[in-house]
């Protein structure tokens, strides 16, 4: 995969997105997106089949005969725990817009061909092993079921990679670390600093780590408003369990296999998903967070993981 044109990131989708919030997410039965769109978790298979609650994403097609020779954004449905340690949205946060927007941007600015529909599956779905990359959002309340633990372990040890994103503070970090210890008890997360090649493989991100931090859109807009004495310049979400001091600094952490391949990567104290999902709703948020942070980081992470 090679970079074709970074400049096109400056062309955002436009439309009247909603701040509306639905009834929260479960991993069985009917659940709702943040735009109150019902989703049958037993039937849903793609992001494309669910109505947008932000801005519509362009559709595209791939060369006939090569429809399966593509990168697919695979979102994992999972069970989540107490809302007191995180939001009620769990796995469905930012769905379906973040999945489709990132997929579109990947095929727009690189030579990588992407699935225009995306996938949403459970860890217990046999199709899991058809895809080399999976994504979990808001894993701060993740509760893996007993039958999911050995499946995820097998997936990761056999070449798959997991990206966990959008969780904040010490309490949510502790939960993610604990759940991953169930999967890979012999391994641990290590911090990646800005000298790591993952930050320079496509876009050369020569900035401090916190300059890659993306908050939710509301916080992002407030952080750009000099008339807001409380939030101007605050690109973190200060209200999560563990206290604001544990939410300030962004961390990118990884679990490696014995050959030095990343099996799991965590973007902690960062909401990349909102940067992808909400790109068309506010000019300031788009230019500061989607264009400069969430998209370049995602392109780098996916390129690196798919080529190493």
Model-derived segments and spans:
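An acidic, glycine-rich "communication" segment
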Residues: 14-22, 27, 54, 84-86, ...
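Extracellular/periplasmic catalytic domains that process cell-envelope and extracellular macromolecules
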Residues: 64-69, 126-130, 155-157, 183, ...
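Surface-exposed patches in mature extracellular/periplasmic domains of secreted proteins
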Residues: 112-122, 164-169, 187-195
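Aromatic-Pro/Gly-enriched surface loop or interdomain linker
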Residues: 10-133, 137-140, 271-272, 277-308
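Short alpha-beta junction capping motif
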Residues: 73, 133-174
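Stable alpha-helical elements in mature extracytoplasmic
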Residues: 98, 102, 148-151, 172-180, ...
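Solvent-exposed loop/turn segments at secondary-structure junctions
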Residues: 78-82, 128, 139-143, 162, ...
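Sec/Tat signal peptide C-region and signal peptidase I cleavage site
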Residues: 3-10
């Amino acid at each position: 995969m090679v970079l074709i044109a970074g400049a096109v990131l400056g062309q955002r989708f436009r439309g009247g997105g909603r701040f509306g919030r639905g009834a929260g997410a479960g991993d069985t039965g009917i659940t709702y997106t943040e735009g109150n769109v019902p989703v049958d978790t037993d039937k849903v298979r793609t992001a494309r089949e669910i109505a947008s609650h932000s801005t519509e994403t362009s559709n595209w097609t791939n060369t006939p005969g090569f429809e399966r020779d593509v990168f697919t954004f695979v979102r994992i449905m999972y069970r989540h725990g107490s809302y007191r340690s995180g939001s009620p949205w769990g796995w469905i946060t930012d769905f379906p817009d973040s999945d489709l927007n990132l997929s579109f941007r990947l095929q727009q600015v690189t030579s990588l061909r992407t699935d225009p529909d995306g996938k949403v599956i459970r860890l217990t779905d046999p199709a899991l092993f058809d895809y080399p990359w999976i994504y979990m959002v808001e894993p701060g309340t993740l509760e893996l079921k007993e039958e999911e633990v050995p499946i995820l372990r097998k997936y990761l040890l056999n070449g798959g990679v997991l990206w966990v994103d959008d969780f904040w503070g010490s309490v949510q970090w502790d939960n993610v670390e604990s759940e991953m210890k169930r999967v890979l008890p012999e391994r641990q997360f290590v911090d990646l600093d800005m000298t790591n090649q993952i930050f320079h493989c496509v876009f050369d991100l020569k900035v401090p780590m916190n300059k890659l931090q993306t908050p939710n859109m509301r916080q992002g807009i407030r952080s750009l408003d000099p008339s807001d004495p409380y939030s101007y310049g605050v690109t973190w979400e200060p209200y999560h369990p563990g206290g604001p001091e544990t939410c300030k600094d962004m961390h990118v952490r990884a679990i490696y296999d014995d050959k030095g391949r990343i099996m799991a990567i965590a973007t902690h104290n960062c909401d990349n998903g909102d940067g992808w999902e909400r790109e068309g709703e506010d000019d300031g948020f788009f230019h500061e967070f989607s264009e400069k942070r969430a998209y370049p980081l995602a392109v780098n992470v996916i390129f690196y993981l798919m080529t190493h």
